[in-house]
Amino acid sequence: MVKPERVFISIDMERISSIVDWEEVGKDTKEYQFARKIMVQDLNAAIEGALDAGAKEIMVSDAHGRMRNLRPEDVHEAAVLMRGSPKPDSMVEGISEGHDAAMYVGYHSMKGTLNGICSHTISGSTVQRVWFNGRETGEFGMNSALAG
């Protein structure tokens, strides 16, 4: 079994542990600081998992909203954090052909998903549907296609 040495992690916020409502992920809400705390805990758990699997290099892309949710000093020291926008490749900024694995943490269901929590695709107010190679897809599918 080949161990993934170079791992890329894209982390969104809407489906991190215990998040169930839009009020928790909007930067101007009182619940946002709680969501940021949980977001970094989920991220650091994913980083630990990648390290346990043999990762030697880990790149993280803060992928929620304006992409400034994670404080660098809170992120596991084994990872390199990319944050802020604009990013040409948006949620997967920093991924390259040299990465052996991609992880998607906190990703949510696409817009229109029955009973999906915080379902949307890119921007719920402007994007209604995205089709890729004849299939409707959400952020996970779009970013996986970019990742290769």
At which residue positions do the language-model features occur?
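Internal, conserved structured core segments that host functional sites
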Residues: M91-A147
